[in-house]
UniProtKB/Swiss-Prot annotation:
It comes from Thermosipho melanesiensis (strain DSM 12029 / CIP 104789 / BI429). It is found in: Cytoplasm. HAMAP family: DNA_HJ_migration_RuvA. Residues 135-139 are annotated as: Flexible linker. This is Holliday junction branch migration complex subunit RuvA. Residues 64-135 are annotated as: Domain II. The gene is ruvA.
Amino acid sequence: MIYAMYGVLEDIENGKLYLNVNEIVYEIVVGDTGYFEDFLNEKIKVFTKMIVNDDEISLYGFSDVLKLKLFEKLILVNKLGPKSALKIITSSDVSYIVSAIVNEDVKTLSTLPGIGPKTAERIILELKDSMKEFDVTLTEKDKKILEAIEALVTLGFSRNQSKKAVTQILKKDDSLDDIIKKALKFLSR
């Protein structure tokens, strides 16, 4: 299997990266191209998972190893394919997803795209015990940050814009409401 690839990012189109590795250009499916857009025509490392189906071979790509590991766990869940798993990972932060699974939070998981209550319950049932390797413990501050990002994404901002805004304006003692208000002001500039 191909764990990671290092090459020049030649193009980004329709949720796919085109990575030139030693004069061979690979098509890599990614859920959110936003992270990679800053690296066009530069050398980058993409963590990958190769999926072989009856009719195609696909490479799925991730910006970091935690996203790859979570993807590998999610595709093991009964009736959850790689496209659904990718949608889940790109819709939220890894720590937010893992925390919801560990805490058996069906409601939070159900807010992710393509996940209803039954699928959320199945994910929790099948993955709860295997989430220990992620060692995710969210502080109250982390929870506020993630909730603020989720709120901004719900309002139509991209995940990358939302993360950038929240990290720029974050103060130690801000309430969730204050964080969201300040982030909205930051984003409306």
